[in-house]
Amino acid sequence: MSATLSFDDKAPTWDANPVNQERALAVAAALRQRIPLSTSWQALEYGCGTGLLSFALQADLGAVTLADCSPGMLTVLEKNISAAGLTHLHPLALDLTTDTLPAERYDLIYTLMTLHHVPDATRLLQDFYTLLRPGGWLGIADLDQEDGSFHGAGFTGHCGFDREALRAQLFSAGFSHVDFFTSYLMKKATDQGLREYPLFLAVATRP
């Protein structure tokens, strides 16, 4: 993923940003509300960063694999896990755009602000389907479609997603019971001033 270097640079101060903290807590609350989480579940967070979202959910889940392709983020994550003394959170260096799929299968896969960085989102959704056990749940929190101002000039990923287009992609990948909810309203300073960007939560199941 092209943003690896910038995420490595951001990793040491990521957890100090109150917006990152607030966003993770809001999405965790939305996931709890929409998915019947269980401490018997094995879960995968893809694009976990420093682990803010999974730390907010860790008491609701069993073993959690926290996967990311940024070495800097994973270094901070490992320190966070060690400091908290949590033995059911497991870091994993993984980039599904290039790496082989893990052998493990999961009851839940979730992402936060990851999908818009992945060039081939359709393929990633298909990978998520493969990685889920039958009856498993998927939760994707990401940007609603925007005008490109969120990242600014030079960004090569997706400028958010149209909900109905993503719904169709999820159905095409094999998912069922696809629903969308607004999970967070993010305020961000841009070249055009302070802007608001809604984040959706897409929830789906593998039949």
Label for each model-derived stretch:
Residues 202-207:
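C-terminal lobe and adjacent flexible extensions of AdoMet/dcAdoMet transferase-like proteins
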